[in-house]
Amino acid sequence: MIVLYPFVVVVGLLCEAAVLVLGSMLHTTLGLNLGITVAILAVATLITFAGTMLSATGMHQKQLNILLRDMDPERFISVYEPLLKKAGKRPNVQLTMLAYLSTAYANLGQYEKALELLDEAPSVKEQVRADGLLLGNRCLIYIQMNQLDKAADCLTRLEAMVKADKTNALGGDVVQSARCLRIRLNASKGWATDVAWVKAVAASGQPPFYAASNQLMLGQVLLADHNKAGAKASLEKAAGYSTNLWACRRAAELLAGLEASASKEA
């Protein structure tokens, strides 16, 4: 991600120049042994490089947190999208950025734009994993659009990839994503699956963006399991996170439906 923040590179180069000047002074002015001087310069160079990389990673995470912690997809897009041009011909960086931007646009309800961004994803070295990530993202967008047939098609293809993956090329996060998507799709059809596992996922510590999504998933599963009280509690948690996220808005819709149903029964 360092390519996205050229000024961090400039600072790193200035620090490296300072290190070289210091090394020269140690050798010429103080008469320090050449071998020791070279060793000191090598260590200082590694520290400078590591510091530069950490600075860039920290800046990238800070921007991601606008979406993941602040739950503000519109502001995230305004900050993050201009960086896309700086990715240049670095396909892994492009893929990561397009996936996050697609997620942000989908949460604003701009589904066609979200799908277009996934279509722009470049080929990468770890193509199997990339294909799995993109299929999972596409499946979730179709669920958000309530186009369940298209979502099911994407998920069937993703599950086939998971089944065929004997070397863990997809990665554990993609495998778990496939499981969650199957649970969500089943719940949308009134089938409750993996209830205990979903409860454990929802109870795990997550950034607010993911926590809201997991609480919605739990609420939907409990609804399908005819546990209205439990569903209501989970949906209230999901809806309470923000109005900027699809998961929160969907939870509020389901909650309103539950309350309307309860009023009729009363």
Language-model regions, residue ranges each:
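Membrane-proximal, non-transmembrane interface segments of integral membrane proteins
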Residues: 66-155
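Alpha-helical repeat scaffolds
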Residues: 76-84, 112-122, 148-163, 190-204, ...
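Transmembrane alpha-helices and immediately adjacent membrane-cytoplasm interface residues
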Residues: 36-67
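"A position-specific structural signal for the A-helix of alpha-solenoid helical repeats
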Residues: 62, 93-100, 136-140, 144, ...
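Structural motif corresponding to the intra-repeat A-B loop/turn of tetratricopeptide repeats
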Residues: 70, 108, 145, 188-189, ...
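Solenoid-like repeat scaffolds
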Residues: 47-53, 82-91, 119-129, 157-170, ...
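Long, non-transmembrane cytosolic or organellar matrix-exposed soluble domains/tails
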Residues: 193-266
